[in-house]
UniProtKB/Swiss-Prot annotation:
Cellular compartments annotated: Secreted
Similarity annotation: Belongs to the FARP (FMRFamide related peptide) family.
Phenylalanine amide PTM sites in chain numbering: 9
Name recorded for this polypeptide: CalliFMRFamide-7
Entry GO terms, CC: extracellular region
Keyword Secreted part of the UniProt annotation: yes
GO process annotations (BP): neuropeptide signaling pathway
Species of provenance: Calliphora vomitoria (Blue bottle fly)
Keywords annotated in UniProt: Amidation, Neuropeptide, Secreted
Chief localization: secreted
Disulfide bonds: none
Ranges in a coiled coil: none
Amino acid sequence: AXGQDFMRF
């Protein structure tokens, strides 16, 4: 979410 888009996986 927001700046944590890299945690989508």
